[in-house]
């Protein structure tokens, strides 16, 4: 089961250099085993709305998240110590520490292009790694 980091969605939304790798991942993945944090959705919402892409944001949430079966996870305030623990132990900023805490709490592998996760116990995988291990 996988927690998809914000930068994976940004690669897709902004059509960056690894967009095809991301598209391949989503077309091949069992989306019932794919998760996103509420923090990622909020971050993506900030980006969409800053660009005045209100309808595009709703389309993304409704079609790419809800209709596809991707699950949304969050942390309650009682679990926020897990964020600060990860930030302190692995020298992560808030968004990475939040993702790490969610992945750790729910037993998920982090799918990310962010090398900061390489400093953690859990590490990370990139979409391309998942293709190689399942061929």
Task: Identify the residue ranges that each predicted region occupies.
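Short, well-structured N-terminal submotif of metal-dependent ribonuclease cores
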Residues: 1-36, 50-60, 131-135
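Phosphate- and divalent-cation-binding pockets in alpha/beta enzyme and binding domains
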Residues: 21, 43-44, 82, 119-120
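Short, flexible helix/strand-to-coil boundary loops that buttress conserved ligand/catalytic motifs
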Residues: 13-14, 48, 87, 121
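A generic structural signal for short hydrophobic patches within well-formed alpha-helices
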Residues: 9-10, 41, 117-118
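Active-site-proximal, substrate-binding regions of enzyme catalytic domains
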Residues: 43-71, 78
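Active-site neighborhoods of divalent-metal-dependent phosphate/nucleic-acid chemistry enzymes
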Residues: 71-113
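Acidic, PIN/NYN-like endoribonuclease modules and their adjacent C-terminal/linker elements
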Residues: 1, 67, 73, 104-135
